[in-house]
């Protein structure tokens, strides 16, 4: 099946014009989307809980209200709080104040797909899912570009929800990169699988396993870090630009032969079965139940794992290596103040 890609020239922003947009939450995506929409000429207000971010958003020049107050004023409400908090914010503040015929948007379908949020039938429900972190989304926009987004419709009582979703995606800058249609279920399943099996879970385990293999064999941790982690960005950039073909073309013949010969020794049938098991847990709701139970228990296991990883040799070596290259930190100029503060504290 061929998926149509929409660009700026294909999308009319009129369905979103003259509508007040309330972005609920000012984390990475909320920050990027609200700022990009405002620059694109849309009427944006923020809905937040009192706290540091409330004051930070005011300094950024937005009108700031509670989530309930922002929802009551808005025609479009975009849920940008963390997945694990959305159901509570929805139940207490958004649902009681959402007008019939309003557009309710999400950047990830978790709460809709797993039944944690169930909007009334008279509410338009859409997804606009940027395919990248918020700071990159903001950076690309400021530099004149954008990142691709997916859009989809869950409920459409007014008949124009898809057009509103595409206009929103254009407003955050995705029209110059490409906008693709999806469904809530497809976006949620593929996003969770990609994160867990490949982009984050699979990749971090692969990198650390390679690092440990070299160190255990007596090689320098710093050089092992360069070989298994630091160079990863350059290899991924080649794949990003031209797929595996460009990566193989730009690497040596020695590298290419070794990659094709020995790659299957690393990603074995057992690894592939593990991926299928991860996918099944996402599809049948097992992972969602585990994650919500973990959150409701106070994140004890997650905090334990975070502590273990931070104290490990790989992370400690990475800090030493990155300290030798201070220019690396200059690349991250578009995180929210809260993100930067949290990351600095973690370091």
Swiss-Prot record:
Which segments constitute the KARI C-terminal knotted domain? 183-328
InterPro entries xref list? 6-PGluconate_DH-like_C_sf, KARI, KARI_C, KARI_N, KARI_prok, NAD(P)-bd_dom_sf
**What does the entry list as the binding residues for substrate?**
252
Q: Where does Mg(2+) 2 bind?
A: 191, 227, 231
Gene Ontology terms, MF aspect: ketol-acid reductoisomerase activity; magnesium ion binding; NADP binding
Q: Might you give the EC number(s) for this enzyme?
A: 1.1.1.86
User: A GO biological process this protein is involved in?
Assistant: L-valine biosynthetic process
According to its record, what are the GO cellular component terms? cytosol
Which family, according to UniProt? Belongs to the ketol-acid reductoisomerase family.
| The protein, known as | Ketol-acid reductoisomerase (NADP(+))
Species of origin reads: Leuconostoc mesenteroides subsp. cremoris
Q: Which gene underlies this protein? A: ilvC
